[in-house]
Amino acid sequence: MRRRQLLTTFLGLSGAALSLWFPAAARAEQTAGAVTDLLGREVRFEKAPERIVVANYILNFLMTGGGDALKKVVALPQDGWEATRTGEYKLLTQAFPTILSLPSIGGYHDNILNTERILSLRPDVVLVNIAQYRENAQRLAVLERAGVKTVVLDYHAMKPENHAASTRILGKLLGREDAAEAQCRRYEEALKDLQTRIASLPEEKKHRRVYVECGNEGVGRLGNSYNRTILWGAILEELSAANIAADMKAPYAPLAREFVIASNPQTILIAGSIWRNAAEADSMRMGLTVTEDEAQKRLAGFAARPLFEKTDAVRTGDVWAVDHGSLRTIADYVFPQFIAKILYPDVFADLNPDEEIRTFYRNYLPEVNPDGVYCLRAAATGAKR
């Protein structure tokens, strides 16, 4: 029963049901000159905002608004962006060099915004995520009294209703409602397709044992795994996989090596990005700007970890890498698609999520080259899907 309920929550419903399913706090119920943000706050505008501070989700902002929307941006959180989303930062600054000249207002890592700087820029609105809003409640109240609006978005929770609501808000604010609606419609359709197909499978074809790990710590140290409520763990839950970390008390934490080996995963997923940290030399790299050769070399190190040869996943060559950096966007429905193809290759053979995400960029952000590696199987056992 629980899995069925969660499956509905994650994978979405038909368009008619969605309007009833989204809670009021998460709906983008738009009226003329107003949006209802992700905390249920109605924010009214006398005119369309022309000066915008984007304190988070710049990629989503551009995906929905298009490249011209950058002309309205007066500041970004430049601190830490390059170090934790290197590929994204490189491609966006190449495509839109004016980003480099935008002032930084902080808040990328610690969520603390420089409200004095924001106030000096005279924006019409500040776009923040939920954590930033809560950390800066008093500071943002000062901005509100000065006439600067605050709108809260959320792509972090990985909830379809929040993804869609946030995207519709951006469409409303940027005069791109048609683009936003098309993006939300494709997102909902793609996830509902997964739901329908998996629901029709017999139980014996489900519940494959899976270990997922964030590969930012490198080969020598196990990185975070995820319980059933968050990020990759939530995706596995909704795809009816048996995530070995599903019952972990913390939303995310490293598992003990002995526990992983004893659990004998049938599939191993290593989530990669480009991180600038102490483990940079052998951390898993995936995503924008990453080449297949580089990703394969790094994935080979994870597949060759001591004692992991005892697992079914390594013995059968079911070791994969997925792109961690592209989660938390309106295009991230491709990652449930990728993993569905891994878990149920015959059922989802017709899907091509790699082409799907590239087409998304071509349609909505053609200035950005989406070349990179999004999902990859260890080279000794097969090619990418």
Question: Where in the sequence are the language-model features?
Answer:
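Bacterial Sec-exported substrate-binding components of ABC uptake systems
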Residues: 2-7, 14, 18-62, 178-213, ...
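Structured C-terminal subdomain patch of bacterial secreted/periplasmic proteins
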Residues: 29, 106, 158-174, 181, ...
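Structural recognition of the beta-strand scaffold that forms the well-ordered cores
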Residues: 53-55, 74-77, 125-129, 150-153, ...
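A short, structured surface patch at a secondary-structure boundary
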Residues: 54-55, 60-120, 125-132, 139
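Solvent-exposed loop/turn segments at secondary-structure junctions
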Residues: 58-61, 79-82, 125-126, 131-135, ...
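Extracytoplasmic ligand-binding site segments that recognize negatively charged/polar headgroups
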Residues: 81-87, 109, 132-138, 153-166, ...
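Alpha-helical, coiled-coil/dimerization segments enriched in small aliphatic residues
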Residues: 224-251
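Pocket-lining segment of extracytoplasmic ligand-binding domains
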Residues: 244-251, 256-258, 264-289
